[in-house]
Amino acid sequence: MMRLPKFVYRTPRTIAEAVKIVADTGPESQFVAGGTDLYPNMKRRQQMPKTVISVMRLPELNQITGESKSGIRIGASMTLTDIVENEIIKRDYPVIAAAAHTISTPILRNMGTIGGNLLLDTRCNYYDQNYEWRKAINFCLKKDGDVCWVAPGSSKCWAVQSSDLVPVMVAIGAKLRLVSTLGERMIDASGFYNDDGIDYLKKRPDELLVDIHLPATNGWRASYQKLRRRGAFDFPVLGVAAYVRYESADGALPHGRASDTRGSGVGTGSGSDRVVADAKIVLGGIAPSPVQVNESAQALIGKPLNEDQIQAAAEAAYIKARPLDNTDFVYQWRKQMARQYTLRALNDVHSQSGR
């Protein structure tokens, strides 16, 4: 049986108290929310904090404020179930609710939080094993060893970014607010993740993720498509987030009603004359950080979203995707699926156009 190591558990009631505790206790302390990632890692001796600081009772981290026409703020301790069931998110940001609904199982979504999913540890077949298994192979570069078994000749850890919400947040242009005793800062989700399986976040250990800021829903739509072996529980071995913002043929942004809760997009306006003003395709589950496919975006921008452009964007995603043999399924097949899942995501966005 894998047991948790001994640790001190703290329950601050304010953000100021929480960041002071972590500043006072130093690098051997760590924040925890739902614990669905941290506690299994502690049982496997992948992470060994001596002080664990719960942020589940901080009021500011447990609320959603704002409105879609100017953007909303989501507290980092909102559970994934809260996100899936929230009426504002379902109505105005259905891609967020749809992506959150693909995460794990209902029981774990009841505990896991949106902030925890955005800070999820990178994953690898050689790392996500119990201590005895890892010891038998002399550990790995990510923890206690000196070789990346995925690419033994590389000095880099290739553990993959396996969050379902990260590609979506990068695609739609979300921002994250971090707070420490030194102050606070906002960082774009697109600039928050490093292409390194060990040092995978641009976040200091003393910083607390307080909330996520979503942009206004001004004419954009989005979709998230996930590849996994089972229809529940599994992490993505490929995730594709597609974001498209339209303008009319005369260059004006569309006007119309907000998207309903069907599908997984957001935005306003309809009609076959619209061209794409901005687009992003973001791949998750294939590299240490989310992969933005600029070539896919360029295939879409300035043109109507039709079959030819969708095919070109999907082909660009296939070319850019370079998964390694460090998770489920044969990596060559996962590369092939980058094309198919980009097609699915963009066709989903296209299907939302008449709503």
Model-flagged regions — what are they?
Residues 1-355:
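C-terminal structural segment of proteins
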